[in-house]
Amino acid sequence: YKILKGLVYRALFFCMNIIHRGIANKKLKENCFKSFKESFNKKYGIETDIHFTKDNKIICFHDFTLNRLFKINKSIKNLTYDEIKSNTKLKISVPLLKDVLKLSKKRYLVLIEIKPILNLRNIKILLNEIKNYKNCIIISFKHTNLFKIRKINKKVKIGFSFAKNSKILDIIKTSSKKNYDCLILDKYFINNKSIQNIKKNKYFYTVKEKKEFLKYSKKNNLIFENL
């Protein structure tokens, strides 16, 4: 049983293509409950972003403010979850991470990107929230978040994120660290031999064209959108 269980979890993290912020189209908005549900229904994993509200609720939302999606110039960190719901209820619902995790049914990979730099208290809240979900990987461009996590928890899955302007030597140096699970890399690096030779699971973002998806998806883990 343990062997079979291990194989199931291994399958979650290999040859996997992930939908960026859930399915988004004319009917569905990014990082909303319905977009995640539709993604899971199509048997895809998801990537989502998280922020903490003023009352320490973890929400799935990309931006630091409500301005881009809702034309409301207010910061997430300065609003309670009820205030966010009140401000956005006529457009889309901003989901709690715990509800999205339940929706995944522990079957589909969930990449959880920490957007801000978190304090230790919030790190502990996040770890407690995901403790029963082995289908999660916590990722961040702000690597200090991941170092804090490792000091508290040696087993939770983590991944270092890198932008297009990252130096290859920095990526390789980070990849030599122990006790992490994957790298999240801009697709700019997908044809780089030094990067491909790194013996760690890698996810390349963000693929937006079907032709590009078909070209690379057989041999790479891709984070894609709107295909």
Residue spans of the language-model regions?
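Phosphate-group recognition and catalysis centered on beta-loop-alpha active-site segments
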Residues: 4-227
